[in-house]
């Protein structure tokens, strides 16, 4: 069952002659983990903005096509209404945090929706425990670490109970520990909470391991789509457009060029076994 349907969507910002999105068609299944990759400026972030109605309602430009979210056409419904269907998390958590405490930050959106007090507290407690910030609920958000800030930004979206969580490079400004915390949370939300995940991420190693499907953007178009192991077999093409390859794909590709394997995308165990075999053969 599809939770999002994107139908022939094109978009051009008001101050630009060029289209940032060109004839995008995509169906996203309920519960799916979709990874989005592509070079800078390829349209990934713009695409994310179409999924919760910021485009066309809040961002000026020329918009064509339709985005259907859980049966609602984004043209016909407000951003506030769509926010209960699709939650959006940006690169920089500081741009989304502006309250005095962690608790107030998470409560803010619910107060604006007029949620009953008992239900509001149930959601706040659930979200903060899920992102492991309940014990820091009285903290001043700027005092949190980078990973904690991003987890707080995610919690402030989760309390809306969206069916889909869209994350636009949420780890790009984090240190290794912060990245690990946020990516671990994203896995949990998909596997345990059954939330549909749409993740724009340069960490292709993570996407190869955990995404159900990957979409590749270039110059405003979808140029590749499929299972991670199928997408990453297109090594030369991905290198040509500037996509970072997963580590074991780079290793597998070099082994393939040497005639040691038939495909570039290998499991971790396969990489170890082939390297071990090549090493032993070299010693004999």
Swiss-Prot record:
Occurrences of domain ABC transporter (ranges): 4-244
EC number of this enzyme: 7.-.-.-
Gene Ontology cellular component terms for the protein in this record: ATP-binding cassette (ABC) transporter complex
Classification via InterPro entries: AAA+_ATPase, ABC_transporter-like_ATP-bd, ABC_transporter-like_CS, ABC_transpr_CbiO/EcfA_su, ECF_ABC_transporter_ATP-bd, P-loop_NTPase
One Pfam family hit: ABC_tran
Membrane topology: Peripheral membrane protein
Record keywords, A-Z: ATP-binding, Cell membrane, Membrane, Nucleotide-binding, Translocase, Transport
GO MF term list: ATP binding; ATP hydrolysis activity; ATPase-coupled transmembrane transporter activity
Compartmental location: Cell membrane
Binding site for ATP: 38-45
Xref: PANTHER family: ENERGY-COUPLING FACTOR TRANSPORTER ATP-BINDING PROTEIN ECFA1, HEAVY METAL TRANSPORTER
Family: Belongs to the ABC transporter superfamily.
Protein role: Probably part of an ABC transporter complex. Responsible for energy coupling to the transport system.
Full protein name: Putative ABC transporter ATP-binding protein PH1815
Organism: Pyrococcus horikoshii (strain ATCC 700860 / DSM 12428 / JCM 9974 / NBRC 100139 / OT-3)
Native organism taxonomy: Archaea, Methanobacteriati, Methanobacteriota, Thermococci, Thermococcales
């Amino acid at each position: 069952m599809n939770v999002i349907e994107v139908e022939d969507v094109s978009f051009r910002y008001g101050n630009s002659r060029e289209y940032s999105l060109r004839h995008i068609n995509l169906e996203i299944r309920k519960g799916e983990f979709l990874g989005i990759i592509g070079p800078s400026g390829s349209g990934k972030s713009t695409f994310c903005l179409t999924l919760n109605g910021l485009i066309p309602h809040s961002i000026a430009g020329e918009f064509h096509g339709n985005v259907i979210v859980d049966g609602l056409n984004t043209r016909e419904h407000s951003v506030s209404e769509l926010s209960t269907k699709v939650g959006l998390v940006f690169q920089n958590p500081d741009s989304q945090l502006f309250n005095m405490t962690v608790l107030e930050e998470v409560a803010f959106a619910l107060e604006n929706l007029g949620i009953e007090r008992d239900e509001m507290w149930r959601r706040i407690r659930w979200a903060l425990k899920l992102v492991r910030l309940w014990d820091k609920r009285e903290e001043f958000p700027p005092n949190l670490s980078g990973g904690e800030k991003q987890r707080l930004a995610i919690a402030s979206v989760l309390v809306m109970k969206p069916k889909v969580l869209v994350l636009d490079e949420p780890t790009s400004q984090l240190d290794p520990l912060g990245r690990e915390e946020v990516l671990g949370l994203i896995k949990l939300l998909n596997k345990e909470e059954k939330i549909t995940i749409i993740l724009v991420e340069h960490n292709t190693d993570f996407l190869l391991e955990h995404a159900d499907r990957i979409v590749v953007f270039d110059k405003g178009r979808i140029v590749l789509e499929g299972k991670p192991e199928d997408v990453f077999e297109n090594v030369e093409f991905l290198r040509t457009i500037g996509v970072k390859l997963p580590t074991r794909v780079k290793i597998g590709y070099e082994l393939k060029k040497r005639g040691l394997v038939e495909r570039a995308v290998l499991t971790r165990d396969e990489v170890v076994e082939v390297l071990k075999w090549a090493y032993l053969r070299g010693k004999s």
